């Protein structure tokens, strides 16, 4: 299966020209644009190929997190765009699990310090609201809770799907190794990545695609390939961004013929509020 991998297009700052490539599906690992505008662009740009789309942190800016999640799911329903949040989808024998995967803020071992650092530094906690009934802003305790919920949903996914034929899509990074080396020791890096190396080694999905960090990376944790292809901000573009990047994943020979069949969809509805 050929997957067109993109993230962090940040079209709130202007539309990005993405080329048409030959692929079996497109993965957009968050921060396409703010609010619901990214979904509208995706439907125009990729009308004829299955698309797996998740929210990054920027989609939620100016929004209530649960409300936008519900809206995007409803607007994507019945289209070729599969908006997932702690949900999964099977295409051609490859199982995709996707979520924003907020970090646990414990990258350096001390989650309390991470909570303080992220809470005072990250715009996420100033520009995103969490309550559907009131106006409370998102707080670090919320993103830690959401991280734990996503990790538990992923464990349940691995319990019923072959990891060797699975692809994980997240916005936030699963390992410090995705960060540039000169950024790894910074206290705020806990808001960009979690230390899930052991989790990955335990389950060994074939591929893990993420975004959020505007720095391209491609490495392995055990048998798992970890990959990101972010465009970044227009004033600070990622010069290693490859707009036509296509990566291949392998399915069982028995599943290869499914690529020409209608999509088999097994989406688990969002387990979050």
How should these model regions be labeled?
Residues 10-16, 33-37, 58-68, 88-90, ...:
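Active-site environment of divalent metal-dependent phosphoester hydrolases
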Residues 1-54, 59-68, 140:
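N-terminal active-site segment of His-dependent metallophosphoesterases
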Residues 79, 180, 186-206, 213-273:
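Binuclear metal-dependent phosphoesterase catalytic core
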Residues 52-59, 64-125:
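A basic- and aromatic-enriched beta-loop-alpha substructure that forms the phosphate/nucleotide-
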Residues 20-21, 91, 157-164, 204:
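Glycine-rich phosphate-binding loop signature in dinucleotide/nucleotide-binding domains
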Residues 97-167, 174-183:
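Active-site-proximal loop/helix segment associated with metal-binding centers of metalloenzymes
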Residues 5-7, 26-31, 52-57, 82-86, ...:
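Active-site neighborhood of phospho(di)ester-bond hydrolases with catalytic His/Asp-centered motifs
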Residues 1-4, 88-98, 165, 220-225:
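Beta-strand-turn-beta hairpins that frame and shape the catalytic cleft
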């Amino acid at each position: 299966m050929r997957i067109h991998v993109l993230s962090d297009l940040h079209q709130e700052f202007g539309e990005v020209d993405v080329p048409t490539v030959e692929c079996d599906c497109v993965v957009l690992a968050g921060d396409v644009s703010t609010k619901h505008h990214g979904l509208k662009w995706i439907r125009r740009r990729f009308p004829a190929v299955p698309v797996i789309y998740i929210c990054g942190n920027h989609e939620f800016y100016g929004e209530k997190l649960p409300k936008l999640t519900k809206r995007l799911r409803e607007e994507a329903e019945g289209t070729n765009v599969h908006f997932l949040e702690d949900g999964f989808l099977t295409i051609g024998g490859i199982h995709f699990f996707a979520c924003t995967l907020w970090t646990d803020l414990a990258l350096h071992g001390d989650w309390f310090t991470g909570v303080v650092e992220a809470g005072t530094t990250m715009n996420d906690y100033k520009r995103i609201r969490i309550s559907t009934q009131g106006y409370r802003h998102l707080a670090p305790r919320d993103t830690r809770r959401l991280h734990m919920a996503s990790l538990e949903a992923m464990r349940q996914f691995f319990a019923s799907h072959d990891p060797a034929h699975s692809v994980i899509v997240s916005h936030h990074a699963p390992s410090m190794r995705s960060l540039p080396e000169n950024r790894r020791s910074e206290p705020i890096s806990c808001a960009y990545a979690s230390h899930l190396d052991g989790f990955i080694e335990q389950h060994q999905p074939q591929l893990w695609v993420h975004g959020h960090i505007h720095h391209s990376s491609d490495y392995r944790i055990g048998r798992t390939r970890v990959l990101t292809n972010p465009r970044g901000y227009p004033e600070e573009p990622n010069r290693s961004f490859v707009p036509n990047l296509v990566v291949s994943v392998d399915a069982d020979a028995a599943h290869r013929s499914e690529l020409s069949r209608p999509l088999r969809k097994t989406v688990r509805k969002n387990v979050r509020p």
